[in-house]
Structures are given as structure tokens and as C-alpha cells.
UniProtKB/Swiss-Prot annotation:
Ubiquitinated by RNF146 when auto-poly-ADP-ribosylated, leading to its degradation. Deubiquitinated by USP25; leading to stabilization. ADP-ribosylated (-auto). Poly-ADP-ribosylated protein is recognized by RNF146, followed by ubiquitination. Gene3D superfamilies: 3.90.228.10, 6.20.320.10, Ankyrin repeat-containing domain (1.25.40.20), Transcription Factor, Ets-1 (1.10.150.50). It comes from Mus musculus. SMART domains: ANK, SAM. The modification (3S)-3-hydroxyhistidine is found at H238, H553. Oligomerizes and associates with TNKS. Interacts with the cytoplasmic domain of LNPEP/Otase in SLC2A4/GLUT4-vesicles. Binds to the N-terminus of Grb14 and TRF1 with its ankyrin repeat region. Interacts with HIF1AN. Interacts with RNF146; this interaction leads to ubiquitination and proteasomal degradation. Interacts with NUMA1. It catalyses: NAD(+) + (ADP-D-ribosyl)n-acceptor = nicotinamide + (ADP-D-ribosyl)n+1-acceptor + H(+); L-aspartyl-[protein] + NAD(+) = 4-O-(ADP-D-ribosyl)-L-aspartyl-[protein] + nicotinamide; L-glutamyl-[protein] + NAD(+) = 5-O-(ADP-D-ribosyl)-L-glutamyl-[protein] + nicotinamide. ANK repeats lie at residues 23-52, 57-86, 90-119, 123-152, 210-239, 243-272, 276-305, 363-395, 399-428, 432-461, 463-489, 525-554, 558-587, 591-620, 624-652, 678-707, 711-740, 744-773. Keywords: ADP-ribosylation, ANK repeat, Chromosome, Cytoplasm, Glycosyltransferase, Golgi apparatus, Hydroxylation, Membrane, Metal-binding, NAD, Nucleotidyltransferase, Nucleus, Repeat, Telomere, Transferase, Ubl conjugation, Wnt signaling pathway, Zinc. This is Poly [ADP-ribose] polymerase tankyrase-2. It is a peripheral membrane protein. GO terms for molecular function: metal ion binding; NAD+ poly-ADP-ribosyltransferase activity; NAD+-protein mono-ADP-ribosyltransferase activity; NAD+-protein-aspartate ADP-ribosyltransferase activity; NAD+-protein-glutamate ADP-ribosyltransferase activity; nucleotidyltransferase activity. Its EC number is 2.4.2.30, 2.4.2.-. Residues 873-936 form the SAM domain. The lineage of its organism: Eukaryota, Metazoa, Chordata, Craniata, Vertebrata.
């Protein structure tokens, strides 16, 4: 082996005895070894390019260049005739040398120029042996990729793997970078995969997981290109993973149609079963992969096979439609297969009226096509049986082949006779523009040609390639067809053509026969009578010719059909007739002009419209690459819009061009999509670009107000994002979902809040938008706010937090008189006589300072919900206060002296000592506890005490026995009315269940209200015109904290951007969840919910001088000289009065009423 090892490095050993070589040859060898391309170019001649180193190993220049890795020199030598298979003394070819020294690029170059990857030297060493021995991993991979055989043994019986360096063994076992290979197949990294792929690892299995092969992963992840490459390089379509799944299972489970098709075309078994006996069809059907199911069935998948649970694919189909489709297509494919095999028994088993015209989903073949092509003797019987059952004689495949085409091509003359007798069109054209005669002539079927000619097949029809049947046949066929052609053109034919051109119906009727109806103008353009009649607008002639067998698909020598002629000259009636008789609207002439190209170029608007209505494709290009739109003249804007179709409507909606929208829109396209962009509808664009009139027109004509684009946005999202208040209001009017979410769970309120759209936020909230909804990031609209006013608005709309509450103070007998509370709540001089509530409500405007003092003495008690001890003789709150300080032993002193909490607030060390509290520590504890109680903190414990500073809101619970409670309840119940909307907004009810009535105490709001009341009174002759009115709003929580805020009012209200009140509680009840009832209660989304609690405000409202109004009028402020607007009932106007103020401080929320509406007796659900 020592001699052979020297041979392996032949290039290195070649210098020995070089002096014996002629100088020019020696110089060439040296230049090749050193990589001196310029010298090589000077020295190489055709005679010297394969010269030998006679003093050494008989190496050629290519041996030297390859061994030393001189790629440029190798490339030049190969281009100039170097022999890639030349052997030196040891039998080595240049490839051996390049592989031995690891020159991968040179190896690749030599292999591309035909070097044998399995060439053997004198010791049977291959290039792979050389690379493996030296551990040249890259070279091993290149050799294996080019067909190197790893099992070849040298003269010692050793393979490349036996001799391989440890670093190269993994390549030869298929384990080299296996994980990277599998990952590249999964991720679709072609370059990475091809750098690692060899025949030894193409079917490697993952070491963990499901033991998948690269093909399993590529199929499951829909890597179409990777699948193609793997299959090309020998991937096993039958390879199974740990669960016995084949790659086809993966592709079908995920619905990857192209991958499935590739696998079945490469022999994948469509009925392969995994360990649980699931077939690929089980996988596809259970996941509702409809198209994949159809594909599998067309390749023989059986939907009746049962898995281990005794379930078939049909059983696993999730929808009735898919179950039905699986059964139907299985029967259909069974019928097609029986027809191919001409099996009468099976045909009868599967044949029915429903199945007789079943089409193969991919090829569009019918059973009649299959029978016509069948080589079996009973095909004629099968065809007759199918035709008796109603098979369509002229049905076409995907390539436009009729059964007559198929039978003619196969010389099945018996079938030709049968289908012609059943009215087969003998001149029907396939996708190449060929008749049955073309196909028979091309195949040299002389008898078939003769038979077709006898049935009137036209030998002069020119195919799309410009050939007649005569030109496609052999000598015998040509002779036969020449005779038929000369017989076919007579004087009568010429007269018929002239009559059709002139519109002479009588002459046409006289001359027209079955043989002559499709005669040709031989001397001219090969036109038929129908071509002439269509081009010259001879409507009656066209009608007659079509009724008597004229071929609507006949082409002249330019490839024009009659429809081209009619469209080019704008003959609408003729074009309509031709289309009704089956003319193909997308047929193309030799220059690939369709009828639509003709009509568009000539400015024929109505013709274009007709063609488009019947499926003409406006994207088809002629030979110059022009679509019909490209050929329209600049002035024909109507045709341009027509051809642009949906794109034109979308553009018009975007630009706000109402006239164009009206012209272009129809029920079919009003919800069309921007397929090149975000899949927006016209309404999305109109809403986003603030085109109010366009939006309104689209909504009136069927636009889907809640249509989602690609990102899940509805038009309201767009309007909200860009702050288009009027458009948003219009969308809401047409029932846009105010809480609709996009793919990232953003609502319109998120959009408006993020962009600082205050008015839009107010509008959305007023119509039931939920401010608590979170997007995928967990953010509410409030979290996205940047503007302070929007932040305030959203904060106000958030669900009510726990407010401090207390029961209305009630002093026990012997402490205060029974009228103490009423006195504290009564007004100074007198109550306004205009208040509409019961008389006890007329005394509610008393001194707020007195009220606060009373509240402070009972707040802590009310906050805990504990009941007062009726027999204690003292306010329970002082008892709780003393107990929390740990001074219970002092209770006797407080009871004896009748010290209540409000009295204690005024006492100091001196007063406490006088009543008998002598210990300084006790007095200090009491005084500090009181200080904390009034310092603004909240809680039972004096060290975390109730806010009584006057800056916040306190709710006083009224007892049901209290006259105040009863008066408010009476006002609520007595003002319920039946509304025109039948309860749509506020629910169906006739009374309430009053759960709670709370008095709202807020010193700041009260002072603001009284100040404004005084101003109004002074401006209105000392008459404030104060009323007690109801107000419904989703902002109740904000109102009782901050008062009414006119900044958030919506201008779209009946009387503009004001704050609305009603004297009827049922009227205000319509607004508790938003305008028009919003979206109903938060939990059930029901406007007539009888379970959820509602809240209504009974407010003190200063109307001052009110402006009477009977019809809608948009106002941002009250009319000059007035303080409010009163909407009076009128015919076709309001049914119940409404009161509107335009300044928030003109109303004070006096009572918060919590209630339920009650279902009327006898009312049935739904």
C-alpha cells in the first residue's frame, strides 16, 4: 500500500524525474501546479492539453491542477478539451486527486463536466474512499450528492465507511448534522438543506419526538419546494414515524393541498394506516379539509375504511355537507373507474340520475369520457347505458375535450357512432382549437376521419396553432381530407355566406343545411355564415343560424369567433344571443385578444358590461401583455371603472365620489374587498376617509356594517381611529357593534382613546362601549390614553368603585325630636313650588353644612352595615368609635352625658375632664382619634377613618320606611309609560322593583349647583324654574363623583350637545346602558334584562328660562337669552317631554336609585 499511497498524492509526486520531460511540457505542468492561469493560457494547445508527465506518474495537466486545487486552471483546461476521465499510472483520474486533498469546489466542477464519481484506481479505490480516508467531509457530501456509491469495496474488501476518518464517518452513516437537516426541512431553508442532503440521510429519522423524516416535517409544515426537492432526491413517501404516520397523513391533517398532490403523484398510498388505523382521509375529513378530501378521493381513497374505533372518514366529518360530499364523490369516482374498465355490473351498481354526469374534480372527466377511452370491448354498451341515463354528450374536460374527441383519438369508431347519434357536436373545439377530426388525423386513424367527414365534420377549421386537420395527418389522411374539402365548398356555400352577410333571411333559410350551416369563406378569412351575420349585426340571421346548428365556437384563420366580431362592432343583441347559445366569453384569437379586448378598445360600454356579467376575465393579457383595461381610450372613464370592477368602487368610496359609487355599486359588490391591501370593504374606506354621504349610501344599499378586514377591523374601528364622529354615529345608527374586537382584541374605543378622540369616546361610551375590555396585551382603553380629557372621560365611565355609604341618621327617642332630620334637610326660606315630585321632596335643598354634620356622626356605622342598637339610648357610631380605641370602660360616662360623635368632635381636654375623664392618656387618645376621623382617611378604625372633609361623595341609604324613600319610589313607578319602540331601548316592563335609594351628598357639587341656580334665578326675574327630573346614563358613577359635564355631550342628539332629562322615569330608563339602550346589560347583553340591577338618577335641575322646541335642532349651547330647551311632544315628534341643559352645573344628582325592571305578567319569553 505504500506505493498506492504515493499514487494517491500523484500530483505531489509528479516532479520526480521531471528533467526528462521536454521543457515546454514541464513548464505547463509547473504552471498548472502553481495555479498560474496566464501561463497556462499561453502554453496550452489542443495537442498539449492532455500531455503526460512521462518522467513521473503519467499525470495530465488536469491531474496537477485538480490535485493542487487550482479551480481557475481546472476550469480553463476543461473548456479547452482536457480529458476528465484521463488516468495516470495508478489508475487515478483527476477527481481522485481533488478528493484526496479536499478541494470541494474543484470536485464539483469536475463532476459537472462528467467525471465519474465511482471511478476506480488500480486498487479499486474510488474518489469517495480518498475523501473518507482523509476526513474531507464537504467532499464526501458532494460526491454522495452526485451519485457516489458508498458500498463499493477496494481490493482489500473495504468500503469507504470502513476506511473513513472518524470525522467523516457520520456523513457515510447518514447522521452528519441530522438535526440541522431536519430543522431546515421543517423551516423551509432550501439552501441549508441542499448543503447537507445526501442519499444516505434523505430518509433519516429524528432521534427524539415522533421520529419524523425530513419529508414528514416538510409535508406537515407545507414546505412545497422542500417536498419537491426531497422527492427528487429519493425521499420515501412510505416512510413511517413513531405512530406509523406517513408524510401524507401530515399533509392531509393540516390541509396542505399542493403537498398532498405532490405526494400522491409520487406514489404515496392514499389508504395508508397509522397505528390507530387512521388513513389520510380520516385526518383530512376530521379537520374539515374539503379540497384535500376531494383530491384523495380522486386518487382512490376509500371513505368507508374503519379506524380502531370503528369510525369511517364519513363518520368523522364535522359537517353534514362534508359527509354528503364524501359519499357523493366516492360514488362518482367508483362510477368513473367502472367506466374505465367497462364493467357493466359495477356501472349499474353506481349509476343514477344524480351520478351520471359526475365530473372528476381535477380533470373534469365524466363517465362517458372514461368509457369512450376504455380499451375494453363493452365500452359501446356502457356508453349507450350512460346516454340513456342522461349523460351529457358534449360535456368537456379541463382541456375542453368532448367524448367525441376522446373516442376519435383512440379510433373507437363504435363510440363515435353512438355519441354522434346522440347529438354530439362534430365541430366542437378543444383547448388547442382542434376538432375531433384534427385528433383523428394526427393519430393517422383513416377510418375515423372518413366517419367524421360523413357526419359533417369541417376539415377546414384551423387550430390555434394555425393548422387544419389535413396539415396534421399522414399521406393517406391528407388525400382523404383534400377530397372532403373540395367537395365541401360549392356555389351554394358562397351564396349562403353572401346572404348571411347581407341579412337575407329567406335566402339563408333556402340554402342552409346541416352540411352547409358551418361552411367557410375559403378565399377569405375562413369565416362561417355566423361570423358574417354577427359582424354585420344581422340579428334575425344569427338567430336562425344558431337554431339550425351553427357552431358558435367556429374560428376563422385569425382565431376569431363570431362573438369577437359582434363585440368589436358593438352589436349588443347579437352578442347577447351568442352568449346565450354558449359562446365562450374568454376565448382568444391568435393574438390572444378576447371579445372583451375588442369591446374595450372600441369603447363599447354596454358590450363590456354584458361580457363581464357573463364571466369575462378583465385580467387576461393579449400577446403584447395588455389587458382590456390597457386598451381603453383615455376619455372612456366609464369603461375604465367597469373593467377595474371592485377596485373602481373601492377607489370611489375612498375618494368620496358619490356619483361614481352610485354607478358602480350593486348588491353583488357592495361588500367587495380590497384584495391587494387590507381586504377592506367600500364602507371601511368611506368610514376611514370621512366620506359621510358615501357611507350612508352604502349602508342604505346593503353594506355590511360589521364586516371585518384582514386585521379584524370593522368600519367603526376606522372612523374611531381617525375621529370621524358623524360617520361613527351613522355606523352606530345602522347597528355597528360598538364592542367589536380586531385580531389584537382592540375595540373602537381602544382606537379612539389611543388617538385622543374625545368626542368619539363620548359617543361610543354613550352607545354602550365597554371601557373595561382588554386587548391582547391586557390593556384597557384607559391604559392607552394620551390626552387628559379622554383620560377623565374613560375614568368616569369605569364601573363604580365602592363609595362610602351610611344609613340616614335616626336619633333615638329622648335624644332628638322626630323632625330633627327633616329640619336638617329642609331649605331656608321655602321650596320651589314647581318641583314635580311629591311634597316631601320639596324640602330637599337644605343647608349642606348641616347635612354634612349629621352624616359625619353616622358614616362609620353605615360603612360597616351594622344595625343601630334600638335600646342603647345613644348613636351606635360613638359606641363603635370608643370600642375601637379600647376605651369601653368609659361608655357609661358617654351614655350618661349623652355624648354623640358630632358632640365629641367639638370637645377638648377641658370639656372631657369636666365630664369625668380624668386620665390625660385617655383624653389624648380620644382627641387624636377624632382628628384622624375628620382628616380625610376612610375606615371603621379611628386610625383609618371615614372621609368627611366635604371634598368627596357620600351616599346615604334611605330606609324603605322613610317618607323620602317612598316619595321617590312613587315618582319612579307613577311615571312609567309605554314607548313607541315597543321596549327596544329600555326593555319591556310596566313597573320597577326598587332595590335601593341613596341620597347623594357632595358639598363641592352642591355649592357649584346652588351658585349656578342663583345666577339663573337673577337672570330670570328671581325664578330658577327648578324641577326634579330623571336622568339615565352609563356615566352614573362619574356624575355622582364629579357632577354633570357638558363637554362629553354628543352633538347628534335631537337638540344637540346637551344633557338630557325627563319627567318620565321610563324615558330615562332607555339611556341607562347608552343611547338607544346601547348593547344592553354588561353580563347578558340584553336591553330587557330582568336580572341585572340598573341605576337611575333623580336630579334637581335648574331650567331657568326654557326655549320650547317641537322638532329636532342641533345646538351646542342654549339659545340666546335662555338657559335650557324643553322638547315638547308633537305629531311625528317626541311622544314624551325632554328637558335639555347645556351647562353641567345646572343639575345636581340628588338621588341614586338602584332597581330592576319587572317582567309584565303573562308575558312569554321571545
Amino acid at each position: 500500500m505504500s506505493g498506492r499511497r504515493c499514487a494517491g498524492g500523484g500530483a505531489a509526486c509528479a516532479s520526480a524525474g521531471a528533467e526528462a520531460v521536454e521543457p515546454s511540457a514541464r513548464e505547463l505542468f509547473e504552471a498548472c501546479r502553481n495555479g498560474d492561469v496566464e501561463r497556462v493560457k499561453r502554453l496550452v494547445t489542443p495537442e498539449k492539453v492532455n500531455s503526460r508527465d512521462t518522467a513521473g506518474r503519467k499525470s495530465t495537466p488536469l491531474h496537477f491542477a485538480a490535485g493542487f486545487g487550482r479551480k481557475d486552471v481546472v476550469e480553463y483546461l476543461l473548456q479547452n478539451g482536457a480529458n476528465v476521465q484521463a488516468r495516470d499510472d495508478g489508475g487515478l483520474i483527476p477527481l481522485h486527486n481533488a478528493c484526496s486533498f479536499g478541494h470541494a469546489e474543484v470536485v464539483n466542477l469536475l463532476l459537472q463536466h462528467g467525471a465519474d464519481p465511482n471511478a476506480r484506481d488500480n486498487w479499486n479505490y474510488t474518489p469517495l474512499h480518498e475523501a473518507a480516508i482523509k476526513g474531507k467531509i464537504d467532499v464526501c457530501i458532494v460526491l454522495l450528492q452526485h451519485g457516489a456509491e458508498p458500498t463499493i469495496r477496494n481490493t482489500d474488501g473495504r468500503t469507504a465507511l470502513d476506511l473513513a476518518d472518524p470525522s467523516a464517518k457520520a456523513v457515510l452513516t447518514g447522521d452528519y448534522k441530522k438535526d440541522e437537516l431536519l430543522e431546515s426541512a421543517r423551516s423551509g431553508n432550501e439552501e441549508k438543506m441542499m448543503a447537507l442532503l445526501t442519499p444516505l440521510n434523505v430518509n433519516c429519522h429524528a432521534s427524539d419526538g415522533r421520529k419524523s423524516t425530513p419529508l414528514h416535517l416538510a409535508a406537515g409544515y407545507n414546505r412545497v419546494k422542500i417536498v419537491q426537492l426531497l422527492l427528487h432526491h429519493g425521499a420515501d413517501v412510505h416512510a413511517k414515524d413513531k405512530g406509523d404516520l406517513v408524510p401524507l397523513h401530515n399533509a392531509c391533517s393540516y390541509g396542505h393541498y399542493e403537498v398532498t398532490e405532490l405526494l400522491v403523484k409520487h406514489g404515496a398510498c392514499v389508504n395508508a394506516m397509522d397505528l390507530w388505523q387512521f388513513t389520510p382521509l380520516h385526518e383530512a375529513a376530521s379537520k374539515n379539509r374539503i379540497e384535500v378530501c376531494s383530491l384523495l378521493l380522486s386518487y382512490g381513497a376509500d371513505p368507508t375504511l374503519l379506524n380502531c374505533h370503528n369510525k369511517s372518514a364519513i363518520d368523522l366529518a364535522p359537517t353534514a355537507q362534508l359527509k354528503e360530499r364524501l359519499s357523493y364523490e366516492f360514488k362518482g369516482h367508483s362510477l368513473l373507474q367502472a367506466a374505465r374498465e367497462a364493467d357493466v355490473t359495477r356501472i349499474k351498481k353506481h349509476l343514477s340520475l344524480e351520478m351520471v354526469n359526475f365530473k372528476h374534480p381535477q380533470t373534469h372527466e365524466t363517465a362517458l369520457h372514461c368509457a369512450a377511452a376504455s380499451p375494453y370491448p363493452k365500452r359501446k354498451q356502457i356508453c349507450e347505458l350512460l346516454l340513456r341515463k342522461g349523460a351529457n354528450t358534449n360535456e368537456k374536460t379541463k382541456e375542453f375535450l368532448t367524448p367525441l374527441h376522446v373516442a376519435s383519438e383512440n379510433a373507437h369508431n363504435d363510440v363515435v357512432e353512438v355519441v354522434v347519434k346522440h347529438e354530439a357536436k362534430v365541430n366542437a373545439l378543444d383547448s388547442l382549437g382542434q376538432t375531433s377530426l384534427h385528433r383523428a388525423a394526427h393519430c393517422g386513424h383513416l377510418q375515423t376521419c372518413r366517419l367524421l367527414l360523413s357526419y359533417g365534420c369541417d376539415p377546414n377549421i384551423i387550430s390555434l396553432q394555425g393548422f387544419t386537420a389535413l396539415q396534421m395527418g399522414n399521406e393517406n389522411v391528407q388525400q382523404l381530407l383534400q377530397e372532403g374539402a373540395s367537395l365541401g365548398h360549392s356555389e351554394a356555400d358562397r351564396q349562403l355566406l353572401e346572404a348571411a352577410k347581407a341579412g337575407d333571411v329567406e335566402t339563408v333559410k333556402k340554402l342552409c343545411t346541416v352540411q352547409s350551416v358551418n361552411c367557410r369563406d375559403i378565399e377569405g378569412r375562413q369565416s362561417t355564415p355566423l361570423h358574417f351575420a354577427a359582424g354585420y349585426n344581422r340579428v334575425s340571421v344569427v338567430e336562425y343560424l344558431l337554431q339550425h346548428g351553427a357552431d358558435v365556437h367556429a374560428k376563422d384563420k385569425g382565431g376569431l369567433v363570431p362573438l369577437h366580431n359582434a363585440c368589436s362592432y358593438g352589436h349588443y343583441e347579437v352578442a347577447e344571443l351568442l352568449v346565450k347559445h354558449g359562446a365562450v366569453v374568454n376565448v382568444a384569437d391568435l393574438w390572444k385578444f378576447t371579445p372583451l379586448h375588442e369591446a374595450a378598445a372600441k369603447g363599447k360600454y354596454e358590450i363590456c358590461k354584458l361580457l363581464l356579467q357573463h364571466g369575462a376575465d378583465p385580467t387576461k393579457k393579449n400577446r403584447d401583455g395588455n389587458t382590456p383595461l390597457d386598451l381603453v381610450k383615455d376619455g372612456d372613464t366609464d369603461i375604465q371603472d367597469l373593467l377595474r370592477g371592485d377596485a373602481a368602487l373601492l377607489d370611489a368610496a375612498k375618494k368620496g365620489c358619490l356619483a361614481r359609487v352610485k354607478k358602480l355599486s350593486s348588491p353583488d359588490n357592495v361588500n367587495c374587498r380590497d384584495t391587494q391591501g387590507r381586504h377592506s370593504t367600500p364602507l371601511h374606506l368611506a368610514a376611514g376617509y370621512n366620506n359621510l354621504e358615501v357611507a350612508e349610501y352604502l349602508l342604505q344599499h346593503g353594506a355590511d356594517v360589521n364586516a371585518q378586514d384582514k386585521g379584524g377591523l370593522i368600519p367603526l374601528h376606522n372612523a374611531a381611529s381617525y375621529g370621524h364622529v358623524d360617520v361613527a354615529a351613522l355606523l352606530i345608527k345602522y347597528n355597528a357593534c360598538v364592542n367589536a374586537t380586531d385580531k389584537w382584541a382592540f375595540t373602537p374605543l381602544h382606537e379612539a382613546a389611543q388617538k385622543g378622540r374625545t368626542q368619539l369616546c363620548a359617543l361610543l361610551l354613550a352607545h354602550g362601549a365597554d371601557p373595561t375590555l382588554k386587548n391582547q396585551e391586557g390593556q384597557t382603553p384607559l391604559d392607552l390614553v394620551s390626552a387628559d380629557d379622554v383620560s377623565a372621560l374613560l375614568t368616569a365611565a369605569m364601573p363604580p368603585s365602592a363609595l362610602p355609604t351610611c344609613y340616614k341618621p335616626q336619633v333615638l327617642s329622648g335624644v332628638r325630636g322626630p323632625g330633627a332630620t327633616a329640619d336638617a334637610l329642609s331649605s331656608g326660606p321655602s321650596s320651589p313650588s314647581s318641583l314635580s315630585a311629591a311634597s316631601s321632596l320639596d324640602n330637599l335643598s337644605g343647608s349642606f353644612s348641616e347635612l354634612s354634620a349629621v352624616v359625619s356622626s353616622s358614616a362609620a356605622e353605615g360603612a360597616t352595615g351594622l344595625q343601630r342598637k334600638e335600646d342603647s339610648g345613644i348613636d351606635f357610631s360613638i359606641t363603635q368609635f370608643i370600642r375601637n380605641l379600647g376605651l369601653e370602660h368609659l361608655m357609661d360616662i358617654f351614655e350618661r352625658e349623652q355624648i354623640t360623635l358630632d358632640v365629641l368632635v367639638e370637645m377638648g381636654h377641658k370639656e372631657l375632664k369636666e365630664i369625668g375623664i380624668n386620665a390625660y392618656g385617655h383624653r389624648h387618645k380620644l382627641i387624636k382619634g377624632v382628628e384622624r376621623l375628620i382628616s380625610g382617611q376612610q375606615g371603621l378604625n379611628p386610625y383609618l377613618t371615614l372621609n368627611n372633609s366635604g371634598s368627596g361623595t357620600i351616599l346615604i341609604d334611605l330606609s324603605p320606611d322613610d317618607k323620602e324613600f317612598q316619595s321617590v319610589e312613587e315618582e319612579m313607578q307613577s311615571t312609567v309609560r309605554e314607548h313607541r319602540d315597543g321596549g327596544h331601548a329600555g326593555g319591556v316592563f310596566n313597573r320597577y322593583n326598587i332595590l335601593k335609594i341613596q341620597k347623594v351628598c357632595n358639598k363641592k357639587l352642591w355649592e357649584r349647583y346652588t351658585h349656578r341656580r342663583k345666577e339663573v334665578s337673577e337672570e330670570n326675574h328671581n325664578h330658577a324654574n327648578e324641577r326634579m327630573l330623571f336622568h339615565g346614563s352609563p356615566f352614573v358613577n362619574a356624575i355622582i363623583h364629579k357632577g354633570f359635564d357638558e363637554r362629553h355631550a354628543y352633538i347628534g342628539g335631537m337638540f344637540g350637545a346637551g344633557i338630557y332629562f325627563a319627567e318620565n322615569s321610563s324615558k330615562s330608563n332607555q339611556y341607562v346602558y347608552g343611547i338607544g339602550g346601547g348593547t344592553g346589560c354588561p353580563i347578558h347583553k340584553d336591553r330587557s334584562c330582568y336580572i341585572c340591577h340598573r341605576q337611575l338618577l333623580f336630579c334637581r335641575v335648574t331650567l331657568g328660562k326654557s326655549f320650547l322646541q317641537f322638532s329636532a335642532m342641533k345646538m351646542a349651547h342654549s339659545p340666546p337669552g335662555h338657559h335650557s330647551v324643553t322638547g315638547r311632544p308633537s305629531v311625528n315628534g317626541l311622544a314624551l317631554a325632554e328637558y335639555v341643559i347645556y351647562r353641567g352645573e345646572q343639575a345636581y344628582p340628588e338621588y341614586l336609585i338602584t332597581y330592576q325592571i319587572v317582567r309584565p305578567e303573562g308575558m312569554v319569553d321571545g
